Amino acid sequence: KDEPAQITSRIAEGIANDAVQAIIINGGTGISRRDSTFEAVDGMLEKRLDGFGEVFRYLTYQEIGSPAIMSRATAGIIKGRVLFSTPGSENAVRLAMEKLILPELGHLVKELTK
């Protein structure tokens, strides 16, 4: 079960660590009653990277079709760190990491340190 207080607490721990430049969390981005990661994360974001969720859903649609609309994958900026929130399935994590996060992470971190 996804607990919003635990999610926000773990994110706050990452933000408090000066060595942390990016936070990646997974799971809880669906639409069931227990899925509350999106709400917890969205309330913390100072800037949203809407393109992440949009492109993630597009790529997911290419792989699995219409169930892609149920994903609430998101990304944004919190206190100068980039945060990615992905669905919990192995395939979704692999897709996000290989196609979006790893190819762009260095550029995002560089932009945030300007």
Q: What are these regions, as identified by a protein language model?
A:
Residues K1-K114:
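Non-catalytic beta/alpha edge segments that cap or flank active sites
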